[in-house]
């Protein structure tokens, strides 16, 4: 869906011709990929809608993950014949015709384990193998074993996996890191991109693009051979994110690509479908109905696109933080996504050079440099003194500070003076007793205050360290690890998100109960333990006292979270 073209021709951004040709070649390849599996809402039509609306299961994801026992067309035909008969029982019909997902066995860790021992013991518990799946299963098969987040998340998730892999590498499980990279490469080869997760209902979108960073991580162990091996898949993923760029005029958007009036190319989150999400069917329908002033399809796409961002949901995407139906993800250019695209271009340049293609390496460097200029021009709020998202409707950078603002530092795309301002903004507005706040807004959504998420803690920590802001970085790690340790001491588990307004409490909000496991928290915790403890004295639990800054420690903000951005 393109926005209207401007009335007069605009100057085209300089994009190397060979990159355009490469996009064209990959689009032909994409047309040759196998027919993708259909999601359950399409396979089962009115039956799927009726089951979800009947709320037979507390979690809408349960039926989305159910496996038909026979051809869905036959099940649907039987349903149409039986549904109006006297005494028809929908729950009985579902139980007869579907195999419901099994609840995972409750893991009881051995007593007396340290935090590190607990995490190391969880890796095999969270490992799954689905080389073969049932014919009509929404679960997509993968050739190698993989680590899932835990809880209701029975499949592998794209951006979660990078932070999980950091922990696997820290534990010495390079074989598992290699397996997961191979799985994601398989998805790119099979579907043309990495879906949100390995479910048919996730195929219409991706997630924050960390594949190139995964390959770079693997290269720490295998050297440039990993970069050369996965260069074709990295190029194909890049083409997916840039699909449609060759036909864009200034001021237009196409799928995941945005071309601003001066020709600057940036990216946004996008889902190819504009229907309710099968895993949150009833919730999405209710959200759309609650705002009759907007087309339901527009709201559905913005809900789906927010899921593609990983931040589902957050005031970051909304006009009114208290009303989810005002979200408009597709009209926002995210600072974190474009930072990751910059990093992808830099890694593509490095991989191309390793493969002996210096000309292509130079082209990717040109693209990375152009994107870096775009980030500095459009995704920096000079008045506020922090990085932020760009609003395509108002044609202005937004004012809200979020933890996503640390991504330019994480990928080394930030100017030094701006990184220093980000350090000040972070400790003034986001740092709390239990770690880094996601935003300063209390909306009831899970990607808002008072929740803190492991991946954002690590991005901030690494990003600030990249620019010499070690004290703030160490404080973030220290406060978050203390939160993780206190929760573990009380409950003997690591969880998906934490309440950072205090320590020792899991986070709340969102569409489902708090999940434990938890892949990315495990990975980030291991990285942070090795960061705050000296190599000559590694620690298995979080030390009782701050290990680095003994005095003049940065004090976390004690300001009450504000109700509006």
UniProtKB/Swiss-Prot annotation:
- Give the record's keywords alphabetically: Glycosidase, Hydrolase, Periplasm, Signal
The EC number(s) this enzyme carries: 3.2.1.28
EC main group: hydrolase
Which cellular component terms (GO) are annotated to the entry? Answer: periplasmic space
| Amino acids binding substrate | 152, 159-160, 196, 205-207, 277-279, 310, 511
Q: What reaction(s) does this enzyme catalyze?
A: alpha,alpha-trehalose + H2O = alpha-D-glucose + beta-D-glucose
Q: Where is the signal peptide?
A: 1-30
The record's listing under SUPFAM superfamilies reads: Six-hairpin glycosidases (SSF48208)
Q: Name one GO biological process term.
A: cellular hyperosmotic response
Q: What does UniProt list as catalytic?
A: 312 (proton donor/acceptor), 496 (proton donor/acceptor)
Family from the record: Belongs to the glycosyl hydrolase 37 family.
PANTHER family in UniProt? TREHALASE
Name the record gives this protein: Periplasmic trehalase
The scientific name of the source species is Shigella flexneri serotype 5b (strain 8401)
